[in-house]
Design a protein with these regions (language model features):
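Hydrophobic transmembrane alpha-helices that form the core helical bundles
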Residues: 32-36, 44, 53-134, 138-142, ...
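TM-loop-TM module centered on a large, flexible mid-protein loop between adjacent transmembrane helices
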Residues: 72-82, 114-118, 226-289, 307-339
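A generic transmembrane alpha-helix motif of multi-pass inner-membrane proteins
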Residues: 362-366, 370-431
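Select transmembrane alpha-helical segments in multipass membrane proteins
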Residues: 7-17, 50, 81-96, 129-133, ...
Length: 431
């Protein structure tokens, strides 16, 4: 088992989970989600949070029994054994993580350009900032797990302080009429928005990748996952009330690339806009930081088990070569997709992997000691949310389904190809 000399404790793990979730959830996707569910987006966040809690319970139990830096990849190996199916799911999970990071990097660039004069807000600057933050955080992650955890504790503290302040002020000054159910869209749209809002929670899985760096993962891992999801769900709901209680839906959608900063304008003026925009930069950087740690652990696990060439698992400085490969892929993908497409592809992919993981958990539930009913509910909720997301995407952006199909096909082809390159077999952990 790979062990870091710099262990990760409960609060460090919680901070990493929060950092991974909040960057994508509020700063990158609030505007996109509001375009579907309007001022009822808080309901969608609650539903997405409930699904995440059940998934978190399942992954927490698996992680307690099979602590591994590979997280879900290890759980799939234990449930389904070795083979092309498990390997394809692992490659798909890695690709989904890279796509997610490209979304967050793009969000960082969107907020960064708000500080430029109107005449200088060119696409080239958005690309520059998006790529630059990836390069910087790859270098930071090369220093090892403790440095990642330390940065998360600092950034999460700043982020929570500003967002809590904005939430409290927004709720104090909110206009109840703006939150009236009469402004809500049809109920179907609220459920369809799960295609976006669940993606706001999917970052919690990065906590599973810290298991090998935890002194006592059997106790720390499950508690850290549940704590992170609950705190983030409360934060999302509070912010949704604050934003939509002060801005009409149309304004939120119009400023969807920097919706939270726009929401601060009527309460705090231009200073508030700038403070929230700076916080957005910190939050998205924090999310990239936490997710990069997970991505490099995924490549390590894949390389260790023979799914990627061994070069991916070679240490560079205090981290792994897979981190550098991931950084290059993230920058490339951030240039190819827009936010809504990335969110839909990422959300459906992750929900599919979660569904498969929970079903597999039922096969080995005697090993983990989890509740069969709760795991069944986790699988059912993940599957239902995935179906709803597919239905919505097929109506709103049918071309995304073709991209998603291609995404799965590429994962399968990559898996088969890498097996030939690596010339090794996957071996599950023996515990």
């Amino acid at each position: 088992m790979h062990k870091s000399k710099k262990p990760i404790g409960f609060w460090s793990a919680v901070s990493m989970g929060i950092g991974a979730m909040v960057g994508a959830g509020i700063f990158a996707l609030l505007g996109e989600a509001s375009a579907i569910s309007g001022s009822a987006v808080y309901i969608s966040f609650i539903i997405g949070g409930i699904i995440a809690l059940f998934s978190g319970y399942s992954l927490g139990k698996l992680g307690a029994r099979y602590p591994s830096s590979g997280g879900i990849i290890e759980y799939l190996s234990q449930s389904y054994g070795v083979g092309i199916f498990t390997g394809t799911m692992g490659v798909m999970l890695y690709f989904a993580a890279i796509v997610s990071l490209s979304l967050i990097a793009k969000a960082f660039g969107n907020y960064a350009v708000t500080f430029l004069p109107e005449t200088e807000k060119l696409k080239v600057w958005q690309i520059f900032f998006s790529s630059g933050v990836i390069v910087l955080l790859v270098l930071i992650n090369l220093e090892g797990a403790k440095d990642v955890a330390l940065l998360e504790r600092v950034t999460v503290g700043i982020k929570f302080a500003v967002l809590t302040g904005l939430s409290i002020a927004g709720i104090i000054f909110l206009n109840p009429d703006l939150l009236s159910p009469s402004h809500y869209p049809p109920g179907n749209d609220i459920f369809f928005s799960l295609a976006i809002t669940f993606f706001a929670f999917e970052g919690f899985r990065v906590i599973t990748n810290t298991a090998e760096d935890m002194p006592n993962p059997s106790q720390t891992l499950p508690r850290a996952i549940m704590a992170a999801i609950l705190l983030v769900m409360l934060l999302y709901v509070a912010i949704a009330f604050a934003v939509f209680g002060n801005l009409p839906v149309e304004k939120v959608i119009a400023a969807k690339d920097f919706a939270l900063a726009e929401a601060a304008l009527p309460i705090f003026g231009q200073v508030g806009f700038s403070v929230v925009a700076i916080t957005a930069l910190i939050a998205t950087a924090s999310s990239i930081n936490a997710n990069l740690y997970a991505a490099t652990n995924v490549t390590y696990q894949l390389a260790k088990d023979g799914e990627l060439p061994s070069a991916f698992g070679k240490p560079i400085a205090h981290s792994r070569e897979g981190l550098l490969v991931s950084g290059v892929l993230i920058i490339a993908l951030s240039l190819l997709f827009d936010l809504s497409e990335i969110a839909a592809i990422g959300s459906i992919s992750i929900l599919f992997v979660h569904t498969v993981t929970h079903i597999g958990h039922l096969k080995i539930i005697s090993e983990t000691g989890a509740s069969r009913i709760l795991i069944f509910i986790a699988a059912l909720l993940s599957f239902s949310a995935m179906v709803l997301a597919i239905i919505y995407v097929s109506k709103a952006s049918s071309h995304v389904l073709y991209i998603l199909s291609g995404f799965i096909l590429v994962a399968l082809i990559t898996e088969v190809s890498l097996r030939k390159i690596a010339k090794r077999e996957i071996k599950t952990r023996v515990i």
